[in-house]
Amino acid sequence: MAEKEQPLKAVQVEALVVMKIIKHSTQLFPTTATGSLVGMDVRGTLEVTNAFPFPIVDIPADSHLDGAPANAAAAAPRAKSNAVYQSEMIKMLREVNIDANNVGWYTSANMGNFVNLNIIENQYFYQKELNERTVALVHDVSRSSQGALSLRAFRLSPQFMAAFKENKFTTENLQKSNLRYQDIFVELPVQIHNSHLLTSYLHQLPSPPPAENLDLPPSLAALTNDPLASSSLLTPNFDNLALSIDPFLEKNCDMLLESIETHHTENNNFQYYQRSLAREQTKIAAWQAKRKAENATRAQLKQPLLAEDEWQRLFKLPQEPSRLESMLNTRQVEQYSRQIDGFVSATTGKMFAVRGNLLPGETQV
């Protein structure tokens, strides 16, 4: 194990673990899939060598909670039953000489919608109770279906861990700690690792045969320079040029608008609290001024003075709502915005490539 003073620099995930996460997430989609990660910490690099899913918790059919199955699946990593299950699994892995150090957990996401209270509580549980040097792997099923694997690693920042432990997300505390929504997560780079034997095998796989007949090469030089002769299974293909714009981009825009509406709702609630607080403070100030005038009169008449702190019993100041939900929602808005920006930048070149076919009356240059 590496020294704890050395910070984590990257997360290295075995290809087999990636395939397990993809398979589990795809099978349970759109329900949230969660599981445990095991591996080791080697000189600041967290090596994930194995993974296993958490069992599905059965929810009574007459449950009165909305979205109870989804909530139970998202909260599975910190459930007591799954904690016992995880301990037993790690014990069995140790018996067969497999890396049995808990290094975190994984979860699936849809359209980047993973910044919520469940992932915060799960990761806080892992970093506080199990191992401080643990990560949360987030696999976006919808984003990966567009042709590029979406697998990201996150940890809670020490600054947010301290604030979440106190559970005081008021405006005053946030200003004192200088905690912003950008400081919630610390993202680590993810590296996919293959053994040398597997890499050699992939490069030796034969390419698929061409669909049409090919002319025989006239010479040895022509055969050597033929791109089909040197191509392999790992060569980029034309599938990356597909224009799959509408499903992903439209859904992201809809979810971005929903998050912005939620932000306005949270903002209105906080403004209502400020107005209520101002009204109560005005009443308290008027009461205190009246009590001081009464005490001045009683002092002239040499009568006992009345208590001036009695307003604490007569008036009750409204409690400030927690700013945690607002911070998480703002972080989610940033997540959607980055996704839309990245997707649009990747498709802009494709759109220019087919511009002549999309706009009638224009000819290609």
From Swiss-Prot:
InterPro entries: eIF3h, eIF3h_C, JAMM/MPN+_dom, JAMM_MPN+_peptidase_M67A, MPN. One of its GO terms (cellular component) is eukaryotic translation initiation factor 3 complex. One of its GO terms (biological process) is formation of cytoplasmic translation initiation complex. PROSITE patterns: MPN. Residues 273-303 form a coiled coil. Residues 11-160 form the MPN domain. Component of the eukaryotic translation initiation factor 3 (eIF-3) complex, which is involved in protein synthesis of a specialized repertoire of mRNAs and, together with other initiation factors, stimulates binding of mRNA and methionyl-tRNAi to the 40S ribosome. The eIF-3 complex specifically targets and initiates translation of a subset of mRNAs involved in cell proliferation. Component of the eukaryotic translation initiation factor 3 (eIF-3) complex. This is Eukaryotic translation initiation factor 3 subunit H.
